[in-house]
Amino acid sequence: MTLQHEPSAAFAETLALRALTFLAADGERLGRFLSLTGIGPAELRRNAGESAMLAGVLEYLLQDETLLLVFATDVGVPPEAIPAAHRVLAGRQQGDDS
């Protein structure tokens, strides 16, 4: 299954929030995410709904193909939906989709 077009901003946000939930559901995954990104738990809670944080969560998944594939399977989306959603959120972060 391939994507025919870029996902909507709402889909991208929802997917990123699901990715954050996926990471948070496993202490080891969450610990690795926090360690590698340098984000603290308080900062994560405070900024969880921000485009920059959500883009960062998806970017983290993009750095680990195995984790990305596990997440995609877990939530039932094609793996290529993750970089597409990242592009949408990164564009919003940069103000490209006003």
Where are these regions (language model features)?
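Metal- and O2-centered redox machinery and metal/ROS homeostasis
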Residues: M1-S98
